[in-house]
Amino acid sequence: RHNFILALNSKTHASTTVSSTIYIASSLGIKFFATGGIGGVHFEAENTFDISADLNELSKTNMFVICSGAKSILDLDKTYEHLETLGISRIGYQTDYMPGFWYYQTDKQVDHNFIKIKDLTNYLKIRENLKQDGSVLIFNPVPKNKSIDKTLIEKWIRRSVEKAKKNMIVGK
């Protein structure tokens, strides 16, 4: 969000994050946004304070965000807790659990699972009529037959993080 005005001012090209996209979409009256995964709390955030601006923006911008969870490279346990702390609704569409982006599900339960699109739509209409601030995350997992095994992904991420530390690779 903070770099959006800088890009406009300098008339340069830029890409958008979830936070800047929902900020722009909301200002244009768009109510729905679909993305692969949201940002979240990074591993070792207790030392680095590296938490995606997506979470803060989700807490204050009214948007219905459909996604397959938070990106797998993140600390999904801390991300789940931070979503709850910020009061962001974690809704499942035909799933009882928050998906893990590339894999079908984590062990984190959603606030509610809607099986029928009609029931989900009714919930969203009620929420909109009450003018409750903040976004609703609607988790729609990758199909089971297209998902990657959770243990494989976690192993790859762990190896990559260790390699980055060993090579002193850091970044924004």
Where are the predicted features?
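Ligand-binding beta-strand-loop-alpha-helix segment within the catalytic cores
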Residues: 1-31
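General beta-strand structural signal in soluble alpha/beta enzymes
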Residues: 14, 32-37, 43, 65-67, ...
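Active-site glycine-rich loop that binds ribose-phosphate moieties when present
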Residues: 17-18, 46-59, 63-84, 117-122
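Solvent-exposed alpha-helices and their adjacent loops that cap or buttress functional pockets
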Residues: 24-27, 32-34, 50, 55-60, ...
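Glycine-rich beta-alpha junction loops
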Residues: 39, 69, 94-99, 140-146
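Short, solvent-exposed amphipathic alpha-helical segments in soluble enzyme
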Residues: 78-85, 102, 106-109, 152-159
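Anionic-ligand binding region
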Residues: 101-129
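A C-terminal functional module that forms or caps the active site or interfaces directly
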Residues: 135-172
